[in-house]
Amino acid sequence: MNLNQSRRSFIQKSLIAGAGLTLIDPFSAQAMMKKSKMKLGLVTYQWGKDWDLPTLIANCEKTGLLGIELRTEHAHGVETTLSASQRADVKKRFADSSVTCVGYGANFEYHSPDQAAVRKNIEGTKAYLDLCKEIGATGIKVKPNGIPNEVPREKTIAQIAASLNECGKYAGNIGQVIRVEVHGNISQEIPNMKAIFEQVTEKSVKMCWNCNDQDLLPPGLEANFNSVKKWFGDTVHIRELNVGEYPYQDLMNLFVKMNYDGWILLEARTEPADRIAAMKEQLEVFNKMIGNA
């Protein structure tokens, strides 16, 4: 073996070990890295909800999940109540680490028949967009949270889209993104998300695929995926890749096929005894799926 081959082999093996993978075939890992620029990160949904910010960053560094979506009202404490100096400290903590603060996971919603409630959610979205900018993040996750039965569906869809356009204009002006999670009773059905986005005009408003069972309704995963993929942003939410019956390998195949290069964010629901080991396991499963795509 010549020197270049030896060096190439060493680099391949080092990269695999650093990602927490079982050393299978280094050339397969090299092919995987060439094939996709997707990255696995963490939503502080269950596995990170009780970690303060230094612990959260350290645990993500330790496990190779190098992006974080900060879910609202969790132990990280990153909220709009932070002072300017505290916001600067959050930004510095991420900057001094290998972990990216992808954004904020809020519960703002725009479907209510109560217009005062809708306005409160819009203004709350804007306040948290300011927070995201000041901590070095790039956007905020929001969601439709249903479609009320007592209101014509078309009216609610138009109201959600109009709210997203207002928030999106504000976001675009400060270099942020609105990430709309596919969520909510009826609203999470892909044709309804499509109907919302057909009325969205702001380029800073993007869709966050959420791996719901409704994705599989006729005409099926691939057709539903293709019907909305032009609106995808830089985040996707998944659950544990090796738990349940959602066809994650098929989904990863679709993302690789479209050369998706965003964050695949783990929104885990289980309660493992060792969350660090579980995070490492999910990274290994993710890398294998991308390698097989």
Model-derived regions, located:
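Catalytic domains of carbohydrate-active enzymes, especially glycoside hydrolases
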Residues: L56-E73, G136
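Short amphipathic alpha-helices and their capping/turn segments at secondary-structure boundaries
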Residues: P54-E61, A84-D96, K126-E134, M252-L254
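Flexible loop residues that form catalytic
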Residues: E73, E109, N145, E240-L241, ...
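N-terminal small/glycine-rich loop or linker at the start of catalytic domains
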Residues: M33-V43, C101-H111, I147
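Glycine-rich, proline-tolerant flexible connector loops at the mouths of alpha/beta enzymes
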Residues: R71-K91, P144-V151
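Histidine-acidic metal/acid-base catalytic patches
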Residues: N2-G41, G48-G64, S187-A293
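Active-site acidic/histidine proton-transfer and metal-coordination neighborhood
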Residues: S14-I16, G20-L23, R93-T100, Y110-M207, ...
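Conserved beta-strand positions in the central sheet of alpha/beta enzyme cores
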Residues: E69, G103-G105, K141, H237, ...
